[in-house]
């Protein structure tokens, strides 16, 4: 048996042992929907007209949940808030709840960019203010009167226990619960960037330790994106889709590949996919208002991060709910030669990375996407991608005219949708991007 096989066997053995020793978490008390006093903290940044939950026929309800957690020898109390974004009428509900713990920046940073697909598919979105900073730094200062009673003890284990208790509340389908008319079939936990660390902590601290009464998992699948650190994702008994970006892969520190990479698996006790998307950085201007206007030294990428994450979520949901096995993708390629082009990643003749999950933006290119944006202490720039648009000469060398370019984009787009690497609901966005590229006819160049 190889070292890799032995390690995998040990991980699975430990997981099976942990699963045999579980407890059913207590249900938290629930208040709500909360109607005041004053405005509700929205949990989302201002959105363009036509893209809000209300525009998709969604209702957002706020609830306060409270209970106790274990912290060392103590059992301190907590009280926090959850937001439930649900389709109206309930007949539109898919049976899927996609949850995430509020990022330390105060927003639901996975749902925010991927919301179009989540809402078109009728999923409920559950936002949990599970970290002490969510309450003390973000929510209470926004409206001290409305949120005066909220309090969360510090600590990652506290957050994990709150997630488990809220998950029990949602999965229990209580007649008086927040989703009384919405029969929940599956619950997923999502996490991006700092919140992906919350997801990892939950897997380690509560996934096997806190279970439903029948011993099944509270969380039915995990989506970790823009993940930090070098640790591999934990082996669990539900599907996991892991989507580190070029930012994490490029800074991974390995001679070949990244230390957090592990083999894809269809084993029922270890369902796992690694999706490294070519062209996608930790952050970009399309989905993050922070970059408008651009505070960075270099142009910030306008890559469709949300569309690619929605693709990963779709595969996760279908794998967990319907048993549809998702496709496998090659990892991003390395040449480990940062001195040559500023990147440890292997780049093609256009300056875009080789390998990974493909898309029209790198396969029918009009720009070069890279990482990092700029060194130094400006975090928002260090995690951003770069985008250098082709000049007129380069565009002319690639495409006969605009029609030729748009035709190539459409052809590749249809292939990607068929292969499962792009969702149909984003096709018009891709086409719109293509139509906006200024490629002049030959006689006018």
Show where each model-derived region lies:
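C-terminal His-loop and adjacent cap/lid subdomain of alpha/beta-hydrolase
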Residues: 20-445
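N-terminal signal peptide c-region/cleavage motif recognized by signal peptidases
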Residues: 13-15
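Positively charged n-region of N-terminal signal peptides that target proteins for export
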Residues: 1-6
């Amino acid at each position: 048996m190889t070292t890799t096989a032995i390690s995998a066997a040990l991980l699975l053995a430990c997981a099976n042992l942990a699963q045999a020793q579980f407890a059913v978490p207590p249900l938290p008390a629930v208040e709500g929907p909360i109607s005041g006093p004053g405005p509700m903290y929205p949990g989302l940044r201002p959105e363009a007209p036509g893209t809000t939950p209300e525009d998709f026929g969604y209702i957002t309800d706020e609830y306060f949940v409270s209970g106790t957690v274990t912290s060392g020898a103590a059992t301190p109390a907590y009280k926090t808030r959850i937001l439930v974004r649900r389709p109206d009428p309930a007949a539109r509900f898919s049976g899927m709840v996609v949850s995430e713990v509020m990022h330390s920046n105060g927003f639901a940073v996975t749902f925010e960019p991927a919301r179009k697909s989540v809402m078109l598919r009728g999923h409920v979105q559950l936002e949990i203010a599970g970290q002490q900073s969510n309450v003390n730094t973000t929510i209470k200062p926004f409206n001290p009167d409305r949120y005066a009673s909220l309090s969360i003890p510090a600590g990652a284990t506290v957050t994990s226990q709150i997630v488990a208790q809220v998950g029990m509340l949602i999965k229990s389908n209580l007649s008086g619960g927040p989703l009384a008319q919405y029969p929940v079939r599956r619950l997923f936990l999502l996490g991006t960037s700092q919140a992906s660390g919350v997801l990892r902590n939950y897997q380690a601290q509560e996934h096997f330790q806190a279970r439903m009464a029948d011993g099944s998992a509270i969380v039915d699948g995990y989506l970790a994106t823009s993940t930090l650190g070098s640790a591999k994702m934990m082996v669990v008994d539900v599907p996991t889709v892991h989507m580190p970006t070029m930012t994490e892969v490029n800074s991974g520190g390995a001679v070949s590949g990244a230390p957090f990479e592990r083999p894809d698996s269809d084993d029922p006790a270890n369902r796992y996919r690694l999706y490294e998307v070519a062209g996608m950085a930790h952050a970009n201007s399309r989905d993050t208002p922070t970059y408008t206007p651009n505070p960075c030294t270099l142009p910030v990428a306008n890559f469709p991060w949300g569309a690619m994450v929605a693709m990963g979520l779709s595969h996760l949901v279908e794998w967990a709910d319907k048993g549809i096995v998702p496709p496998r993708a090659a990892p991003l390629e390395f040449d480990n030669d940062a001195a040559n082009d500023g990147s440890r990643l292997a780049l093609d003749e256009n300056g875009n990375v080789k390998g990974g999950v493909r898309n029209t933006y790198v396969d029918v290119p009009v720009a070069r996407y890279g990482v990092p944006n700029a060194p130094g202490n400006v975090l928002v720039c260090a995690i951003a991608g770069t985008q250098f648009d082709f000049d007129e000469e380069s565009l002319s060398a690639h495409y006969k005219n605009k029609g030729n370019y748009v035709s190539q984009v459409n052809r590749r787009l249809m292939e990607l949708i068929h292969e499962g690497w792009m969702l149909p609901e984003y096709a018009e966005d891709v086409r719109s991007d293509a139509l906006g590229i200024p490629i002049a006819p030959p006689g006018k160049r």
